[in-house]
């Protein structure tokens, strides 16, 4: 995969893209009660956080997860408005290079 550092999604674009994907696929991949809980609580406690890809992604994909080009977005709920997300609904691995659309999701079970 040939990737260009000057053709990457910004951090905000990456978060927005991951959240859009989450919203589109959540109803098909989460328990209906979880979808309802997330929708009711997101305004007050919800969030999406951007990280370098965690090591355990290597159990799911077979390519190099260079943090210059790949990001993990965690979507879920926190105990408070400024708290860390501790109730994870999805972990989304995205390629930030605009010409390489790639997404893997680990859903809450």
Curated annotation (Swiss-Prot):
InterPro entries from the UniProt entry: dsDNA_mimic_put, Put_dsDNA_mimic_sf
Transmembrane segments: none
Gene3D superfamilies documented for this protein: dsDNA mimic, putative (3.10.450.140)
SUPFAM superfamilies according to UniProt: Putative dsDNA mimic
Disulfide linkage: none
HAMAP family (alphabetical): Put_dsDNA_mimic
Function: May act as a double-stranded DNA (dsDNA) mimic. Probably regulates the activity of a dsDNA-binding protein.
Similarity field: Belongs to the putative dsDNA mimic protein family.
UniProt protein name: Putative double-stranded DNA mimic protein YciU
Native source species: Escherichia coli O45:K1 (strain S88 / ExPEC)
Gene: yciU
């Amino acid at each position: 995969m040939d990737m260009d550092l000057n053709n990457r999604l910004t951090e905000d674009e990456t978060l927005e893209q991951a959240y859009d994907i989450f919203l589109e696929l959540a109803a098909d991949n989460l328990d209906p009660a979880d979808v309802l809980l997330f929708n009711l609580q997101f305004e007050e406690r919800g969030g999406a956080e951007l990280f370098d890809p965690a090591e355990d992604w290597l159990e799911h994909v077979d390519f190099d997860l260079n943090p210059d080009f790949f990001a993990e977005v965690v979507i879920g709920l926190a105990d408070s408005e400024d708290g860390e997300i501790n109730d994870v609904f999805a972990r989304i691995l995205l390629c930030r290079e605009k010409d390489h659309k790639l997404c893997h999701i680990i859903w809450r079970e």
